[in-house]
From Swiss-Prot:
Post-translation changes: Active after proteolytic processing.
GO molecular function, one term: toxin activity
Protein name: Type-1Ba cytolytic delta-endotoxin
Gene behind this protein: cyt1Ba1
Entry keyword annotation includes Hydrolase: no
Function: Kills the larvae of dipteran insects by making pores in the epithelial cell membrane of the insect midgut.
Family recorded in the similarity comment: Belongs to the cyt1/cyt2 endotoxin family.
Organism encoding this protein: Bacillus thuringiensis subsp. neoleoensis
The keyword Plastid is assigned to this record: no
Amino acid sequence: MKESIYYNEENEIQISQGNCFPEELGHNPWRQPQSTARVIYLKVKDPIDTTQLLEITEIENPNYVLQAIQLAAAFQDALVPTETEFGEAIRFSMPKGLEVAKTIQPKGAVVAYTDQTLSQSNNQVSVMIDRVISVLKTVMGVALSGSIITQLTAAITDTFTNLNTQKDSAWVFWGKETSHQTNYTYNVMFAIQNETTGRVMMCVPIGFEIRVFTDKRTVLFLTTKDYANYSVNIQTLRFAQPLIDSRALSINDLSEALRSSKYLY
């Protein structure tokens, strides 16, 4: 039986068993279980607690759920203000992420990282999506089981499409715009523990700085078949940490972990 842990509208962690999440979460395909692993999606409504990374977590052994939450909290400190044209937007910074990684306890290691900019002119949105996925596959390496590839593809597709349904989400920041250019940042984090990762937890925070050379309304309703001109900066790293068993903690401790620093380091 597949289980999914999520927050309801009252900001409480809940568990859903079966092949899909509650209807209000179902419009995002990566939030649906894709394998026999437990896929945990965590989101809070309270502005004080809301993370600014869209967290996509696959954990085969629930004893390591808390570790995934801790890593997500740690890499929040690697979100930094963007360039001037992005206004008040913030994004995951790979250099800052390298600094944060050195402070995390128990110690882990950064095993891959990249800072790349991809551009395209008058080509389909799907072409840019495929190029971004190719870059991230290289960084994520052995962590890519079949279900993770499915979730990665869905997450990156929604980085460039379906933006009208996400425009007010915590992980999307809209920068300055003109009638000819729209700037936004998008932050995602994968935490993965499965048979391919072995005795470590893989954490992959990703930050995008995206320039689309058209107006915002067009950007909000882009589909994979539409044509668009892009400049996309990708900053990401893959952090590996030895597994930390949290089986002694109850499900209530998951909520506490998001609110109390005593669990973070």
